[in-house]
Each structure stands twice: as C-alpha cells, then as structure tokens.
C-alpha cells in the first residue's frame, strides 16, 4: 500500500530536524452542506534543516520517529519569498487608492 502524501505550509521550524506543517482541507458540513476549511498540524522530520517558515512542502507518512513525529519532508515545493508578498500588498493598496480616487467610497 502506498504511503500517504500531503502538501502544507511550514508554520514552525524552531526544533532541530523537525518542522510543524499546517495542512488545509475542505470538509463539507454534515447538516448545512457548506464547505469549511479545516487545518491540521503535523510534526515532520527535516533531516537537513532546510525548511523555513512559510515554505510550501510535501510530507510523507513514515514509521514513528518520536512521540509526535510520523511524517517526513519529501521535498520543498516553493520557498517563501517575503519580497513577493510585499509586492502583492503594494499592488492591492494601489488598486484600493485608485478606486477611492474615482469616487467609489466617500469618507
């Protein structure tokens, strides 16, 4: 049977050779039938201490490595780039100012 693989974002890298990965999934509410985001955190083994906070990683199920670690980092899909986030925030702010300048919202 193949091992489970999940994709998530590193939320903590403070431990040696261990990262905490948050994995989001959509679950349908049993009564209201609306899809709701659910987040679960997994402790994963990072042998070379390569992962940093904000990285998107793929983790794979493995044998128990400690009391809480049952996953290992397979690969880093995308590195976190703070410059890209700042650029996106600036673009959004410019769009808001452009809309407000055209009389969209009056203060």
Swiss-Prot record:
PROSITE patterns: RIBOSOMAL_S17 (PS00056). The keyword RNA-binding applies. One of its GO terms (cellular component) is cytosolic small ribosomal subunit. GO terms for molecular function: rRNA binding; structural constituent of ribosome. InterPro entries: NA-bd_OB-fold, Ribosomal_uS17, Ribosomal_uS17_bact/chlr, Ribosomal_uS17_CS. Keywords: Ribonucleoprotein, Ribosomal protein, RNA-binding, rRNA-binding. The keyword Chloroplast does not apply. GO terms for biological process: translation. Part of the 30S ribosomal subunit. One of the primary rRNA binding proteins, it binds specifically to the 5'-end of 16S ribosomal RNA. Belongs to the universal ribosomal protein uS17 family. This is Small ribosomal subunit protein uS17. It comes from Thermotoga petrophila (strain ATCC BAA-488 / DSM 13995 / JCM 10881 / RKU-1). The lineage of its organism: Bacteria, Thermotogati, Thermotogota, Thermotogae, Thermotogales. The gene is rpsQ.
